[in-house]
């Protein structure tokens, strides 16, 4: 009895001592500034000789000065803010939501991303189990770009079947109920990713190897590029294209007839504004310091914003009308499951899960942690579960599904700071960016051509990530056949999006059957969804084969181990770390294939 009392007293003393030391450390230089050489964060002075130096590495739980953690957290937030704010604006435009609602969705997305990132980094152990929620690493969550490839198709179908309203001229009216139905469907379908998080990662890698992930990511990026280019040319909606005289009554200038400096779609002025963003990104990549390159997309956007503001393209009424502070649920949407969207949403969560595996592997690599074994598997499990729960909660917070972003891996690699404290600061900064609604309103007020110049580059980087994954698999007959089959319908549906619209001609009273047929139509007309289903199916049924002509020096099996640079992996799949041992494991079991894929990883 006396021993237990002594133990309790010792524990209390330890807690008190730790608290005392923490309070005392607040008043020290080491706590706030430390002895870090902050010149590492500054650009190099041109035409001067400088001694080569490398910043120290800060591990996951190392003591990092508050100032350094704040600066690096801000760097992480800048690297992902463009990717977080673009999807809500694009999806809101597809639902023709009001400017006030669009402002709110951008704010809600930033707030949700900040809160869910905190949970992902903190990592919570589920009591009495071996499972976790979160990775426990510097993993940031943002709005999935895959949603951008699904939502416009779903909302377009809602307008066609009467779920969303049109006026007597056929002009699409605001459809908040359609957006709410998309949220409800996303919320329910997120249970699939939550379920998959409890499947061992090795099995998931067998089900979804690079031959599946590569073409799917390529198709996602390709399908998104058209949306970015439409914005680059002036915007989407009633102003798109140049109408004939018969179509003129329903046509408007971009972004609208009453907007300042309104012009016709595709005008040279619009193309020039978007090109200013694109050119700035290229200039920074060529002449900018390494740390600046990780935020080249945002800096390009800033340059485009300055040019467009100076030439009178901004609608300041959007910013003036926005409240100073906002929060989730200021605007709500009626939640109702839209059956035809279930299949595409399930495909979306499969893709998000595949991306999470690659991102977690990349973050572990640049954080100098294990990329194999039980500890790594636990991080993968926690990360996928964190993604699934974040998407479920985000849907209830009026935000579309979230996923682990990859661009922060480039910041970690350059700054050599994998410390979670920097991640916590990043999450808090994102939260306050969303909390102050004026900040979100700035992103809504950005002229479409300026935003299009940035998003087209972002979306193209998604496609490049898919190409990078594909380039690292053996190009034997089996893999070429799977790629060809998945690209046949996947790329075809992107190029001719309404090719399957008239396949079903049923118009009877059976609403369940109509919903089922609409679901099939959505899948067949969504390039990444049909491509994913085909590649998964063929990968499971086609036998593996050995090609003696393929070696590690073959063009189809690169052995270079690239590192995320914050540009190529803007969307969220690291092509190197997502390449698993799957092909090798299968081949060893069947004693047919001896290609050493581990060298790629």
UniProtKB/Swiss-Prot annotation:
GO terms for cellular component: fungal-type vacuole; plasma membrane; vacuolar membrane. It comes from the Eukaryota. InterPro entries: NCS2, Xan_ur_permease. The keyword Transmembrane applies. The chain crosses the membrane at residues 64-84, 102-122, 131-151, 179-199, 207-227, 264-284, 294-314, 337-357, 424-444, 450-470, 481-501, 522-542. GO terms for biological process: pyrimidine nucleobase transmembrane transport; xanthine transport. It is a multi-pass membrane protein. Keywords: Membrane, Transmembrane, Transmembrane helix, Transport, Vacuole. The keyword Transmembrane helix applies. Its main location: membrane. It is found in: Vacuole membrane. Pfam families: Xan_ur_permease. One of its GO terms (molecular function) is xanthine transmembrane transporter activity. Belongs to the nucleobase:cation symporter-2 (NCS2) (TC 2.A.40) family. This is Putative purine permease C1399.01c. It comes from Schizosaccharomyces pombe (strain 972 / ATCC 24843) (Fission yeast).
């Amino acid at each position: 009895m006396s021993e237990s009392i002594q133990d309790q007293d010792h524990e209390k003393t330890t807690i008190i001592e730790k608290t005392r030391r923490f309070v005392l450390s607040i008043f020290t230089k080491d706590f706030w500034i430390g002895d870090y050489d902050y010149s590492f964060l500054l650009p190099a002075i041109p035409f001067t000789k400088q001694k080569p130096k490398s910043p120290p590495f800060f591990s996951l739980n190392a003591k990092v000065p508050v100032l350094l953690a704040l600066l690096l957290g801000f760097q992480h937030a800048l690297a992902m803010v463009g990717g977080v704010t673009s999807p809500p604006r694009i999806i809101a435009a597809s639902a023709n939501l009001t400017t006030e609602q669009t402002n709110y969705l951008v704010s809600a997305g930033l707030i949700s991303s900040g809160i869910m990132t905190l949970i992902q980094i903190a990592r919570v152990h589920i009591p009495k189990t071996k499972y976790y929620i979160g990775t426990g690493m510097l993993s940031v969550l943002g709005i999935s770009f895959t949603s951008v490839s699904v939502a416009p198709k779903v909302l377009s179908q809602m307008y066609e079947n009467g779920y969303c309203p049109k006026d007597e001229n056929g002009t699409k009216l605001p459809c908040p109920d359609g957006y709410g139905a998309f949220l409800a469907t996303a919320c329910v379908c997120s249970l699939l990713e939550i379920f998959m998080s409890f499947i061992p990662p090795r099995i998931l890698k067998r089900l979804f190897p690079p031959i599946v992930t590569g073409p799917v990511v390529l198709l996602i990026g390709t399908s998104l590029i058209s949306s970015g280019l439409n914005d680059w040319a002036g915007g989407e909606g009633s102003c798109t294209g140049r109408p004939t005289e018969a179509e003129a009554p329903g046509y408007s200038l971009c972004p609208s007839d009453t907007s300042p400096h309104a012009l016709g779609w595709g005008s040279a002025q619009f193309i020039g504004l978007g090109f200013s963003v694109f050119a700035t990104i290229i200039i920074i990549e060529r002449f900018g310091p390494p740390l600046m390159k990780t935020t080249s997309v945002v800096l390009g956007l800033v340059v485009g914003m300055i040019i467009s503001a100076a030439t009178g393209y901004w609608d300041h009424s959007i910013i003036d009308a926005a409240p100073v502070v906002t929060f989730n649920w200021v605007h709500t949407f009626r939640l109702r499951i839209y059956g035809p969207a279930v299949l595409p949403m399930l495909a979306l969560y499969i893709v998000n899960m595949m991306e999470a595996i690659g991102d977690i592997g990349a973050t572990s690599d640049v954080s100098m942690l294990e990329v194999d074994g039980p500890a790594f598997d636990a991080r993968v499990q926690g990360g996928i579960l964190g993604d699934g729960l974040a998407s479920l909660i985000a849907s209830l917070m009026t935000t579309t599904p979230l996923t682990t972003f990859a661009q922060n891996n480039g910041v970690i690699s350059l700054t050599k700071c994998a410390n979670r404290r920097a991640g916590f600061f990043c999450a808090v900064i994102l939260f306050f960016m969303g909390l102050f609604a004026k900040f979100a309103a700035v992103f809504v007020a950005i002229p479409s051509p300026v935003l299009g110049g940035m998003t087209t580059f972002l979306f193209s980087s998604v496609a490049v990530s898919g190409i990078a994954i594909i380039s690292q698999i053996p190009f034997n007959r089996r893999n070429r056949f799977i790629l060809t089959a998945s690209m046949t319908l996947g790329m075809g549906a992107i190029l001719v999006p309404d090719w399957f619209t008239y396949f079903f001609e049923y118009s009877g009273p059976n609403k369940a059957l109509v919903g089922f047929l609409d679901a099939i139509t959505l899948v067949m007309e969504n390039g990444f969804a049909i491509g994913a289903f085909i590649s998964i199916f063929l990968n499971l049924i086609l036998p593996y084969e050995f090609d003696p002509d393929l070696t590690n020096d073959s063009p189809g099996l690169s052995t270079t181990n690239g590192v995320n640079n914050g540009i190529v992996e803007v969307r969220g799949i690291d092509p190197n770390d997502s390449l698993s041992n799957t092909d090798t494991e299968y081949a060893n079991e069947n004693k047919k294939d001896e290609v050493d894929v581990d060298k790629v990883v």
